[in-house]
Swiss-Prot record:
GO terms for biological process: isopentenyl diphosphate biosynthetic process, mevalonate pathway; phosphorylation; sterol biosynthetic process. Gene3D superfamilies: 3.30.230.10, GHMP kinase, C-terminal domain (3.30.70.890). Signal peptide: none annotated. One of its GO terms (cellular component) is cytosol. This is Mevalonate kinase. Belongs to the GHMP kinase family. Mevalonate kinase subfamily.
Length: 390
């Protein structure tokens, strides 16, 4: 068998949206997150220069950088003694060492994962591209981390399963990944997320790894919806309004503490919306069921949006504007994630035409918003092995 170190490895992982339950999840309720058709793609090509070349065109001001592998090996606290099958956090001391090389958190994450998973024993040219806007709450960093981890583990034939038949495949085809290996990818990507976000929930990297959709509670963690969800069409719109997730979350918690008799019923209702959503997904079997599902989802979008904005107080005038525009054109919209700006999602109809979609996007654009069409319920991380052309 040809080693994967002699091949080009191309990996992609999806972004994510929160369908229902945002903010209620911090009050011990259920959130539903789904994988997006918008993905990050990472291509690993071996080189003979004893260097790590990173091409990251989507990261503003980064471009292409190249380092000698020896430069990393000489760093104090280099993660040489890490057991790859037992993911651990990047030490604060090694982060300080990486900061001497480059002062960008996202690149610290990449370099830690590269050093930990390869020990800098093989040189690569690595190119990262993404459909996902950075910093918009769509899981771009988790998609990035999962793609990096999956690719490096594959490149070095590192399998927690010992290399089961499911994980070993030939060239030119999409590789299968067993659940044990997916769990390893997920845990390593979480360590990368910690560098960028401190104490991430783990939702984003789980969605990017396993795909489809999952439920999440603070008490029980995440649970994958094994039946998946229907491939609903959505339009994601970026308000271009930055916000502090921490401040918004703290505001909801404060309201809950001050007015529990008012906020608790709201949280319970949002939890019921999540449950109704799952029940509707389970009742969907063919395209004939789409219209009924659409009606339910339209109602759930409207109700959840009103509760988030009016009762939790995480709305914003930009969100209200988008809700109003889309409603005038016959669509239903809710915020996704933290609110206070960020992104919103609009449910498209199964028969929404190209002209209708173009008109919707043009109207939003003329009001200063940027939007992307996507589907939800997409597959998780995928790996393709390609031979090097000689």
């Amino acid at each position: 068998m040809i080693s994967n170190q002699d091949n080009i490895i191309q990996v992609s992982a999806p972004g994510k949206i929160i369908l229902f339950g945002e903010h209620a999840v911090v009050l011990e309720k259920t959130a539903i997150a789904s994988a997006l058709s918008l993905r990050t793609t990472v291509t690993f090509t071996p080189n003979t220069n004893n260097t790590l070349l990173l091409d990251f065109p989507d990261l503003a001001g980064f471009g292409v950088r190249e380092w000698s592998l020896d430069e990393f090996k000489k760093l104090d606290h280099f993660p040489n003694d890490i057991d790859i099958l037992k993911p651990i956090e990047c030490s604060e001391l090694f982060q300080q060492e990486l900061n001497k090389i480059i002062d960008i958190k996202g690149i610290h994450t990449f370099l830690f994962l590269f050093c930990a998973l390869t020990k800098c024993t093989k040189a690569y040219n690595i190119k990262i591209t993404s459909d996902l806007p950075i910093g918009a709450g769509l899981g771009s960093s988790a998609s990035f981390c999962v793609s990096i981890c999956a690719g490096l583990l594959k490149a070095f034939d590192t399998y927690i399963c010992g290399g089961c038949k499911q994980c070993i495949g030939g060239q030119g085809q999409q590789q299968q990944i067993c659940n044990e290996q997916l769990n390893l990818i997920n845990l390593w990507s979480l360590q990368g997320e910690k560098i960028m976000h401190g104490t991430p929930s783990g939702i984003d990297n789980a969605v990017a790894t396993f795909g489809k959709a999952l439920t999440f509670t603070r008490k029980n963690g995440y649970k994958i919806l094994e039946n998946g969800i229907p491939p609903l069409r959505i339009l994601i719109t970026n308000t271009r309004v930055s916000r502090s997730t921490k401040t918004l979350v703290e505001g909801v918690i404060q309201r809950s503490k001050l007015y529990p008799t008012l906020i608790d019923p709201v949280s319970n209702l949002i939890d019921t919306i999540s449950s109704q959503c799952i029940e509707s997904f389970n009742q969907y079997h063919t395209d004939k069921d789409y219209e009924k599902l659409q009606q339910t989802m339209d109602l759930m979008f409207d109700m959840n949006q009103h509760l988030l904005s009016g009762c939790y107080g995480v709305g914003h005038s930009s969100i209200d504007t988008i809700v109003s525009i889309t409603k005038s054109l016959g669509f239903h919209t809710k915020l996704t994630g933290a609110g206070g700006g960020g992104c919103v999602i609009t449910l498209l109809k199964q028969d929404t035409t190209i002209d209708q979609l173009s008109n919707l996007k043009l109207t939003l654009s003329s009001n200063g918003f940027e939007s992307w069409e996507a589907t939800i319920g997409d597959p998780g991380v995928s790996i393709n092995i390609l031979p090097i052309q000689k």
